[in-house]
Amino acid sequence: MTNYREMYADTKIIVSVSGGKDSTAMCLNLIENGFSITEFTRVFCDTGWEDLTTYQYLDYLENHIGPIIRLRANVAIAPANRELVSRLENQLGFESDFIRYVIQWGKFPASPHKWCTDRLKIRPYTRYLRTLEEDYVNLVGIRAEESVKRSKYKEWEYFDTFECYTHRPLLNWTEKQVIDIHNRHNVLPNALYLNGHSRVGCYPCIMARKAEIRKISEDRISIIRELENLYDITYFKGGKIDQMRSWSMTSRGGTQFFLFDTEKPTCEKWGLCEFANGGTE
């Protein structure tokens, strides 16, 4: 069994929390290894472009893993843009640095230059870390089996940007282990997983899968459509949001429309289909 006490001796433990299953499992793993919630700090970097479900889940999660510090980029609003920002944020339901940045610069993030990660996550997180006086370690919930790229990550790695070591304690965990630790602690997963999403984060992510594009809410599509038309840009590489939504409703080849959703419900792997389309109350 890993001796985390020895591993993190004399070091402040900072856990990157996303509202996703892996970062939640990482917090539960610390608790399971004898750490109280006062012995590690949970930090969430808020892009202002999450699904409302994720914000609600973070509130729920605090009852199980302790308070979560929420960081924002606090993008400034030019006077000429205030009315537009206010209207779109009211439609969204919360303040959004993502929307403010799109309006300020007239562009969506795009691979490989994903400013959403750099401007809205890394920079606020770096500013926070540099306010700390003690030595610290950054814990990240990444698993090797998620992708070929992640399978090449090291468990320990030093980052000059953060001026600290990053530890990936779940690197060799399976998804089943992640689900099992939720169950042992009676912690529900983010409801997005139960409703067919494979990931939690920006909603939608510019790298979203076809099935995830199919599940984007009409309210979010409306905001994306307006920004696309206003700045003559596209959210997804393949075309405008309405084109991509139509494509997402087709089978392979893009010519035959689905009559039924044939994907196996993701709630089955959690054994929680009764919570699908619901929340965490």
Where are these regions (language model features)?
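ATP/NTP-dependent adenylation/nucleotidyl-transfer catalytic domains that generate, transfer
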Residues: R5, A9-D10, L188-N190, N195-E281
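ATP-dependent adenylation/nucleotidyltransferase module used to activate substrates
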Residues: M1-H185
